[in-house]
Regions:
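Transmembrane beta-barrel domains of Gram-negative outer membranes and organellar outer membranes
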Residues: 20-266
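Cleavable N-terminal export/targeting peptides
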Residues: 1-28
Length: 266
C-alpha cells in the first residue's frame, strides 16, 4: 500500500510540466549529512533519494544496541519554482539489543514511520548566494515497535545557507513536537546543525558538520551532540552517490553512525 502511494505521488508530480534539461538548476539533494539544504527542486521535477543502508551503534553501561536501516527513501516533487513537497519512508529497520549483564538479545524488524513535509524557499531557491527556507513537517506512526516512534510528531525546520564560491556554510535550526520515549504523547525538542561544505571538483563534494539537539522527554532530558563527515560524487547532472559517518560527542548520543545512498532526479 505504501509503495503504491509513493508511485502515485511520483506520477502526479511528474504530470507538472518540466523544464528542459539544459535549463535545470544544479542538482541539490538532501543527502548526505546531518543538515537540510535551503534549495528546492525545479517545478515539475521529481527527485528520489534513497539511503541504501545505514548502521548505528549505541552502547551504554547496561546494553548494546545496533540499529540497521534499509531503503530510507525520500521522494521530492517541485510544485512551483520555490515550493516542493516531500514524502519520506524507511522501508525496513532492524534493531538488535543485547543486555550486557544477562547476555539476552532482543531483535525487532519493522517498517519505519512516514514523514510528510513542505519546503518553501524565501530567497534563491537554487541555493546560490544567501538562501533560506521554511520547512514544516509531520511524521505519521506507520512504523512498528522499536523502529517507529509510536505516535505522530511534527516540527519546523529553517534551513539557511551561504554560498561562497567553492565553500558553503549551512545552518539548520529546528523545533519539534517529538514523540515521548514511551510512544505516548509529545514533548518539545530543539536544536541546530552547523556545517561547512567544499567542492573538491565539479563532481565531488565534502561536508563537515556538528549537530546539537536538546530533547525534553518526560522520561529524562538529554542533549544529543554529533559530528559528521560526508561526501558526494555526481557521475552526471541528475544523480549522486554518497557516503557519510557521524560520531557521538557525549553519552546522550549514538557512538557511531555509518550510511551510504543514492539520489536521482527525473
Amino acid at each position: 500500500m505504501m509503495l503504491r502511494s509513493i508511485w502515485l505521488f511520483a506520477a502526479v508530480a511528474a504530470a507538472v510540466p518540466t523544464l528542459a534539461a539544459e535549463e535545470r538548476r544544479d542538482l541539490c539533494p538532501d543527502r548526505p549529512g546531518l543538515g537540510t539544504p535551503a534549495c528546492t527542486i525545479d517545478a515539475g521535477a521529481v527527485m528520489l533519494e534513497v539511503g541504501m543502508a545505514g548502521w548505528a551503534l549505541d552502547r551504554t553501561a547496561d546494553s548494546r544496541t545496533d540499529a540497521f536501516t534499509f531503503g530510507d527513501a525520500l521522494l521530492r516533487a517541485g510544485l512551483t519554482p520555490s515550493l516542493e513537497v516531500q514524502l519520506g519512508w524507511t522501508m525496513l529497520g532492524h534493531v538488535r539489543e543485547r543486555d550486557r549483564a544477562t547476555g539476552d538479545v532482543t531483535r525487532r524488524t519493522r517498517i519505519g514511520d512516514v514523514t510528510l513535509a513542505l519546503r518553501q524557499n524565501l530567497s534563491n531557491p537554487d541555493g546560490s548566494g544567501f538562501s533560506v527556507a521554511l520547512m514544516p513537517y509531520a511524521t505519521l506512526p506507520l512504523g512498528g515497535e522499536g523502529v517507529g516512534a509510536g505516535d505522530w510528531g511534527a516540527g519546523m525546520i529553517v534551513p539557511v545557507s551561504f554560498e561562497l564560491g567553492a565553500l558553503s556554510l549551512g545552518f539548520t535550526p529546528h523545533v519539534d513536537s517529538a514523540v515521548d520515549s514511551d510512544g505516548r504523547g509529545r514533548h518539545t525538542a530543539y536544536g541546530s546543525v552547523a556545517g561547512v561544505g567544499v567542492g573538491l571538483s565539479d563532481d565531488v563534494s565534502m561536508a563537515a558538520e556538528v549537530s546539537l539537539t536538546r530533547d525534553r522527554d518526560p522520561g529524562g532530558h538529554t542533549t544529543e551532540a554529533l559530528a559528521g563527515l560526508s561526501a558526494g560524487w555526481q557521475p552526471g547532472p541528475d544523480s549522486q552517490w554518497d557516503v557519510g559517518a557521524n560520531v557521538g560527542l557525549n553519552r546522550d548520543s549514538p557512538d557511531i553512525e555509518l550510511y551510504f545512498g543514492f539520489a536521482r532526479r527525473f
